[in-house]
Amino acid sequence: MRTTPLVFTELDSGRNGYTVTWTAEPGGRVELSGGVVVTGWRPAEHGRWVATVPDAVLTPRQLYVNGLRASWARSDWLEHEDCKIGPEGMTGAGALGVAAYGRPSDVELVFRVRWRDYHCRITDISDDLIRFAEPCWTNALPGTGRVGPHWDNTAVGTEIHSWSMFASNALESLTEPGHFVWNSDARTVTYLPRDGEDMESAEVIVPVAEQLVVVDGAHDLVLKGLSFAHTAWHRSDGYVGAQAGFTLTGASGPLGEAGSHYTKPVAALTVRGGRRVTVSGCEFVRLGGAGAVFEAGTKDSTVTASTFADVSSGGLYVGGIDPHPTAEAADEGNTVSFNTFHGTGAEYTDSVAIWAGYTRNLTIERNTLEHLPYSGISIGWGWNQPEAQDPWLGGNRIAGNRITDVLRVAERQYDGGAIYTQGPQPGTVIEANYINRSEYGTTANDGNGIYLDEQSSHILVTGNVVTRVGYKWVSNWAEYGVENRAAGNWTDNTITPAFSGAGSVMEDNAEGLSELPPEAVRVAEQAGAGPWPGPVEALGNHGP
């Protein structure tokens, strides 16, 4: 187990045309793990098992039992119509059933509002009032002055949009195998095993370390065939989701209408200011935060042929949230190709598989993204705010990706897209992607195929196959999202797209199809990380 990250600096770089490669010896395997083994399991009532966790563990949010994630026990969705929300907390402890919990101060309430996700810990219950830990609760409410007035309608307790809520980590909810509860006083975990799990012989790992590897200013470096596993994310300020896995942290701070003051999730691998750094054939699995972050002036670097699976937050983050970085801090010329993203956002469901902020000449090509709670690929930032005009953004290419089963209705995260964009991006192209099942099963919650949101401008959308989308196959709703063009795409969708921006055009798109033509089938078959030809779901199948 690593308790501190392995750090590569400029001194660890390749020289004189050579590259330094870190990989397993032939026939070997290297796993970088941030977890410790939990032993001493003893039986308890109702088929549960209990163990004391090692002292190094802070708050365990995940266990891995023989390699399978175990999450905190959770309640059903809670009816909250009679709850009153204010600065002191939320009423309804009795009606929600929370007042009956034996250890309410270990319980978190999780709120889902449109594209935002919130996790705030209960501190105490007084009569019918539930109080929460700070700064999480204050940051979750409207009127913080830190997210801009237009975002208050997606704060906890909004009366404008519907929202959902459940409780997690209550022993009273531990009824489903594969889940557990943490008792902070006794420092024990109580687990309900799955069928066939023998807790006297099972390997149980709990995450401790937040980061495994940091590449800080290194160049000409290759990480090949490594496995990154079992990281934690302590998030001491709670979790107040802003967008795409970014959070609002701290008790105070500057106004962030353009999103330039939000906090990126902690990642197993962080590359800062890297040049020609390659991550190839690696696994990012069983993680409590994000998979990897490339930021702070990382250029000409690549993530390829790697797997991101069972990750609590987002899979991969490229770029930053400063619209006008210095030349040294600007991210440019990076490539994300032939990777597989499966089941990211396992805990923080507002996160995305691939996020790119302010970046230029980024290629996101031939990746497979599947089974995701919210958007698949998100590129751009800034909305329509004055400070986000003329940003470091453009020349990006999103091509040949296979994106299936995203914006899953059961997760109750809304207003996104399989491919989502923000901001003016001259020269950006979205082409030859296969999108199938994006918030499929409802037309009520703004689940799009390709979503050119807010000030998305100067983007070409061409040659894509978009099927089984809950709302629009392509959306450019804002009049200030200008000069976009959607041409030569195929879809079964019949909901009229909103291309409202000045100079935006739609032409030669095949809509309302009952059968994909051969050319569209070929595009869909060749999308993704392989093998090829990939499966293409025939139109007319409207099952789950």
Question: What residue spans do the PLM features occupy?
Answer:
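The right-handed parallel beta-helix/beta-solenoid scaffold, focusing on the short coil/turn
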Residues: 4, 18-20, 28, 61, ...
